[in-house]
Amino acid sequence: MSSGGLLLLLGLLTLWAELTPVSGQDRPVKPGLCPPRPQKPPCVKECKNDWSCRGEQKCCHYGCIYECRDPIFVK
């Protein structure tokens, strides 16, 4: 396979992996809540959703900041 064809295939696979399911069903949200943010750093987009974070971490949204954080659990 030519390098151009390989790059096209890689691009299509990347695009496919980023798309949500056609059925409209998103993955369920992970349990727990995001802890409060202690300070205000510059805008960062570390994640898109809970499933772009490792393990049990959640994708937490603080204004223009999206970052993976360990969840807190409230009784």
Curated annotation (Swiss-Prot):
Detail the disulphide connectivity of this chain as listed in its UniProt entry.
C34-C60, C43-C64, C47-C59, C53-C68
Name the Gene Ontology biological process terms: antibacterial humoral response; innate immune response; venom-mediated disruption of cell wall in another organism
Report the Pfam families cross-referenced here.
WAP (PF00095)
Tissues and organs where the protein is expressed, per its UniProt entry: Expressed by the venom gland.
Matches recorded under InterPro entries:
Elafin-like_sf (IPR036645), WAP_dom (IPR008197), WAP_four-disulfide_core (IPR050514)
Instruction: Offer a single GO CC term for the protein.
Output: extracellular space
Task: Outline the extent of the WAP domain.
Answer: 27-72
- Indicate the secretion signal residues: 1-24
What is stated as this protein's family in its record? Belongs to the venom waprin family.
This one is known as Porwaprin-b
- What is the species listed in this Swiss-Prot or TrEMBL entry? Pseudechis porphyriacus (Red-bellied black snake)
